[in-house]
Design a protein with these regions (language model features):
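Non-catalytic accessory segments flanking enzyme active sites
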Residues: 54-148, 159, 248-303, 336, ...
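Cap/lid segment of the alpha/beta-hydrolase catalytic domain
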Residues: 134-150, 159-165, 179-182, 416-422, ...
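Polar, glycine-rich mid-to-C-terminal structural blocks
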Residues: 222, 226-265
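Hydrophobic beta-strand positions that form the internal "hydrophobic ladder"
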Residues: 103, 153-157, 201-202, 261, ...
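Bacterial Sec-dependent N-terminal signal peptides
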Residues: 1-23, 709, 713-718
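Short, conserved, GDST-rich strand-edge loop motifs in beta-rich repeat architectures
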Residues: 161-162, 205-220
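Beta-propeller blade signature
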Residues: 119-120, 171-175, 218-230, 275-280, ...
Length: 718
């Protein structure tokens, strides 16, 4: 690919048609042109990729000012925010887990920015604060990103993220005294901690980025190190790096008995190899290959003596569990423990001397308990259609705690007796939401090519099929990630206001195994967009809603989905909410970890892949003279997963080709990232802005708890 840049700068004033009062900031254009395999592609907003430039910073300030002026004019914005604060304000807990003499759990009193880690001796003991992330920053933007206790519970290693960045800093706490040691580990990313006894642990880090590049520079050459407690990071021992393949990922883990050190490598977000070291053989320090090829998705569950339990889709698109002998690891020698089923094997964990296998049946959880020999003990019954997680623990455990949730069932914690199979309610949710007033319905429709695709519909009982119901259509469709039922305070608010929250299980996810995933990746990515627009058409045909009442939403890969859908079928939707989306499909691989997505998307550096990427890339398929939906684009200044340049350039182009009365605004959050670790204050503010924008443009009045409505008047000040 060749690139030519002409430094002539042009200034464009964006017309606002009949909504002349909403003045968009001027956005400079340059004569930047790329040549992709003979096709010349203009990139006039390339300068917005430089998030450190004063021009870009000024543009961000101007755009946020215009956005906030518009949002402040929505008559009921403050009422929406107050109601969201009321709904958010209830105690939330995670399932407890035991380490040493203590049970640990996270709790948020309601409006605390970050959940606090508590501990107590016994389930009826007195709780004490163990680690409070709210004390790590004044504004709640520092978050606890992960933690792991040492073998005997003497220490805990934890990592902290600042402003939602994927970069982490690691620390260690002495559990007995609850004091932080002097250890500090920098430049951690995409890693956990794998303890060896109480002496030290393995982790992955990256080389320190160049100045000014830590939020957008390409991350390559991951390095696996061993850190000994109470020593400086500079003395850590390098365990693995691959200079010949610097774009491969690398991570390590240990089996529960600490016999095997496992190294997982991958060339992207799909496909992997597994290497191992038998630590019982101290004379051997090199890794040996266990599962080769990068063509399958292997995951080691644990070991059984000198053999390893591995979940694999090798010859089993819906996955199976096999026992692998490292001495003869070829697939022909594997022993099948849990064979492939019609449903997708989503996870296998261990606990109390048993295996727990989690399956997806039409995107809902089924859980089974097995012996290590593969004999079925029982199905673990869960309350209904929804998502259950948290099964498993240590081999010595007699019980564990799991959580069940659905779209209309707030997270509820159950206590499970491993031997008897008895589940009992441990902690009921205190959410200000009455599930008896709502219902969930799963429907199926035929996509453009005849494929049957499921949709979850969630709404208040008494729904009338008159084509006038407001709908929020949500999807993701990629990276082998399923969209499973889960409760959200934000979505509960929309249902409370009379909306239908609809979730489509698009191809590209893992709802129906690897075949479903592959049907929505690379050159078949268009299937994902067809599934999404097909769901919209189905809801319109069945009189659930109409285009004037339809909003679409998605984040990250789902932001790409929304961008592509609104570009291809703008007439279907009234509101579009692309969040932290991948919008420039020709240059995404040039930033941070984006190159890893090429196994899913393809790369513009290859002619045949450029051709289909260019056809659907949201940035490159916005056309002059089209009335696009009312659009609120969201991103954040510390998003180093999908850099904000994607959203910046998409917003600039959409405002450039703007026609009609629908607003196009971009909300750029400060001191926030791709979404993880976002403080509750920022979550509520963002939800208030998005729902106010959505409801107003769908002509939904705000309903208070007394049944009074507000919002039929025009925008204040416009």
């Amino acid at each position: 690919m060749k690139c030519s840049v002409v430094k002539l700068l042009l200034t464009v004033i964006i017309p606002c048609s009949s909504l002349a009062q909403l003045q968009y900031p001027n956005t400079k254009k340059t004569d930047t042109i790329d040549n992709y395999h003979g096709t010349k592609v203009p990139d006039p907003y390339r300068w917005l990729e430089d998030d450190n430039s004063e021009e870009t910073k000024a543009w961000v300030i101007a755009q946020n000012k215009a956005t906030q002026q518009y949002l402040a004019s929505i008559p009921y914005r403050q009422q929406v925010k107050r109601r969201l604060e009321e709904l958010w304000n209830y105690p939330r807990y995670t399932s407890p887990f035991k380490e040493g003499d203590y049970y640990y759990y996270y709790k948020n009193d309601g409006l605390q920015n970050q959940s606090i880690l508590y501990r107590q001796k016994g389930l009826k003991g007195v709780p004490e604060v163990f680690l409070d992330p709210n004390k790590l920053s004044e504004d709640g933007t520092a978050s606890l990103a992960g933690l792991k206790f040492s073998l005997n519970g003497k220490y805990v290693a934890y990592s902290v993220s600042q402003s939602g960045s994927d970069w982490r800093v690691g620390y260690i706490i002495d559990v007995n005294t609850n004091t932080r040691l002097s250890d500090k580990l920098d430049w951690l990313k995409f890693t956990g901690f794998s303890w060896k006894g109480d002496e030290g642990f393995y982790y992955t880090r990256y080389p320190e980025p160049q100045t000014g590049e830590h939020l957008k520079g390409k991350n390559v050459l991951p390095q696996v190190y061993y850190h000994k407690v109470e020593t400086p990071q500079s003395e850590d021992i390098l365990v693995f790096e691959d200079k010949e393949h610097p774009q491969r990922f690398a991570g390590v883990g240990l089996t529960e008995d600490e016999r095997f050190l496992l190294l997982s490598t991958s060339e992207g977000t799909s496909g992997g190899e597994i290497w191992y070291r038998d630590l019982k053989d101290s004379a051997r320090t090199e890794f040996k290959l266990l599962i080769p090829g990068f063509k399958t998705e292997p995951r080691v569950v644990d070991n059984v003596g000198d053999k390893l339990l591995v979940v694999t889709n090798d010859g089993a698109a819906n996955y199976k569990l096999v026992l692998v002998d490292p001495a003869s690891p070829a697939a022909a020698h594997w022993k099948v423990i849990i064979p492939e089923k019609k449903e997708v094997l989503q996870s296998v964990s261990t606990g109390g001397g048993y295996l727990f296998a989690g399956y997806l049946k039409d995107a809902s959880t089924k859980v089974y308990q097995y012996t290590y020999e593969g004999k079925l003990v029982r199905e673990i019954k869960v309350p209904g259609i929804g998502t259950a997680e948290g099964f498993g623990g240590k081999k010595k455990d007699k019980e564990f705690f799991y959580m069940f949730t659905s779209f209309i069932y707030p997270p509820t914690i159950f206590r499970y007796d491993i031997e008897t199979g008895k589940s009992e309610l441990f902690r009921k949710s205190e959410a200000k939401f009455d599930p008896s007033l709502y219902e969930t319905k799963q429907v199926f429709f035929k996509s453009k090519d005849g494929t049957k695709v499921p949709v979850f519909l969630n709404y208040r009982k008494g729904l009338k099929l008159d084509g006038n119901n407001p709908v929020l259509l949500y999807g993701y469709g990629g990276f082998n990630i399923p969209m499973t039922p889960g409760f959200s305070v934000s979505n509960a608010f929309f249902m409370e206001q009379g909306g239908i929250y609809a979730v489509v299980n698009l191809r590209g996810g893992s709802e129906y195994g690897e075949v479903w995933h592959k049907a929505g990746m690379l050159e078949k990515k268009q299937n994902v967009f067809d599934d999404f627009t097909g769901a919209a058409e189905y809801l319109i045909e069945e009189k659930y809603t109409s285009p004037a009442k339809m909003a679409i939403r998605g984040g990250s890969n789902g932001g790409l989905l929304v961008g592509a859908a609104m570009a291809q079928r703008p007439e279907l939707f009234k509101v579009a909410i692309p969040q932290v989306g991948v919008m420039d499909m020709l240059r995404y691989h040039k930033f941070t970890i984006g190159y890893a997505w090429s196994v899913e998307f393809g790369s513009s550096e290859k002619k045949e892949q450029f051709d289909y990427l260019y056809k659907y890339s949201p940035l490159h398929n916005l056309k002059e003279g089209v009335q696009y939906p009312a659009t609120i684009i969201t991103t954040a200044d510390h998003d180093d997963r999908v850099v904000p340049a994607h959203s910046f350039k998409f917003a600039a182009r959409l405002q450039e080709v703007y026609k009609g009365e629908n607003p196009v605004i971009i909300r750029i959050e400060s001191k926030a990232g791709h979404g993880a670790g976002k403080p509750v204050t920022k979550q509520i503010e963002e939800a208030a802005d998005i729902w106010s924008f959505t409801m107003y443009n769908l002509k939904m009045p705000f309903k208070d708890q007394s049944g009074n409505t507000q919002g039929k008047e025009k925008l204040k000040g416009f």
